[in-house]
């Protein structure tokens, strides 16, 4: 069967607004989109996937939400009953968002095959969101259906471009949780708050040119990410997906924290006149640090940033 060379025309002019500079998808037209969100639980990874699904569904994609917790039906309607129902819905394209309940890799496999079959047959834009990615893809484990599920997800990643199939998947860590194929092919990365310093050795190469350090990741709050895209690296605060807004509890305002890292102090000092910075001698710094109840690490980072800023201005 002859096919025309696929052209991702839906990418041209499409955008993602994730809380920072809008990401234009024109530059992804030749590669497709493979997004990975990395961070511990409660970091906002699921919301990121739902936000992207809502935005892409409004721009011509059909989004398929793989839900291992059976929570998303209350937000987006009843889940499809079986793989055949998913096939039919993807072929008709009359529902912008479809929910698939799959509690483990074994349950995911027939739905994954259905997605691949429809993508290969019709080649119309589909966006798959896989929450709790470690349940369906593992770096080593192959038992209990994970091997077959991982192979299907790898095919999403490796052949998705030619089938108009785009992917978002979550990971708890940068190593040891997902097949390396996904990290090798990713082109949009969201890295959230990190508490484990041993994870930094794997993450550090991502930030080599941006001077971002582990302390910067450790200072992130839920919903904040460093976004690595074709446009570079940007710190963003992810908006809440529309469906979540209706059910999310009202958050209490959090008092603004003082800078904790060299980069945060440096950014804060950029806006302070030179004469005021020059007046911050050792005694003044000690007094202000005591009043603000700064930690020793905050004081050291602030002193280093102050010295660097003054040297830069002279």
Stretch-by-stretch model annotation:
Residues 35-38, 64, 99:
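Short hydrophobic/aromatic beta-strand immediately N-terminal to the Walker A/P-loop
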Residues 35-54, 106, 112-208:
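Conserved P-loop NTPase motor cores
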Residues 72-75, 85, 174-181:
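Short, glycine/polar-rich helix-capping loops at beta-to-alpha or helix-loop-helix junctions
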Residues 43-84:
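Walker A/P-loop NTP-binding active-site region of P-loop NTPases
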Residues 201-230:
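P-loop/Walker A phosphate-binding loop and immediately adjacent motor/lid segment at beta-alpha junctions
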Residues 1-24, 31, 35-36, 139, ...:
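Conserved P-loop NTPase motor module
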Residues 90-106:
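Conserved P-loop NTPase mechanochemical-coupling segment
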Residues 22, 77-92:
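A short, well-structured beta->alpha microelement
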């Amino acid at each position: 069967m002859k096919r025309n060379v696929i052209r991702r025309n839906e990418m041209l002019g499409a955008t993602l607004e994730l809380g920072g500079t809008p990401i234009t998808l024109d530059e992804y037209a030749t590669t497709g989109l493979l997004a990975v969100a990395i961070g511990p639980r409660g970091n906002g990874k699921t919301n990121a996937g739902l936000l992207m699904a809502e935005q892409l569904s409004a721009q011509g994609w059909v989004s398929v939400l793989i839900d291992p917790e059976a929570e998303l039906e209350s937000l987006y309607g009843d889940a499809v009953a079986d793989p055949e129902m998913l096939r039919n819905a993807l072929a008709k394209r009359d529902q912008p968002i479809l929910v698939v309940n799959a509690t483990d890799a074994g349950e995911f496999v027939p739905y994954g095959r259905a997605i691949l079959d429809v993508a290969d047959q019709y080649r119309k834009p589909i966006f798959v969101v896989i929450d709790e990615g470690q349940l369906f893809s593992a770096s080593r484990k192959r038992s209990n259906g994970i091997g077959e599920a991982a192979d299907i997800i790898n095919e999403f990643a490796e052949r998705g471009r030619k089938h108009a199939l785009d992917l978002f998947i979550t990971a708890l860590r940068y190593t040891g949780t997902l097949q390396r194929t996904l990290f090798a092919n990713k082109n949009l990365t969201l890295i959230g708050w990190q508490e484990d310093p041993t994870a930094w050795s794997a993450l550090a190469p991502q930030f080599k040119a941006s001077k971002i350090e582990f302390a910067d990741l450790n200072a992130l709050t839920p919903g904040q990410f460093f976004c690595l895209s074709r446009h570079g690296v940007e710190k963003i605060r992810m908006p809440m997906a529309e469906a979540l807004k209706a059910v999310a509890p009202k958050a209490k305002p959090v008092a603004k924290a003082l800078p904790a890292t060299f980069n945060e102090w440096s950014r804060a000092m950029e806006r302070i006149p030179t004469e005021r910075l020059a007046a911050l001698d050792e005694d003044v710094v000690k007094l202000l640090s005591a009043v603000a109840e700064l930690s020793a690490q905050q004081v050291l980072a602030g002193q280093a940033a102050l010295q660097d800023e003054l040297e830069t201005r002279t």
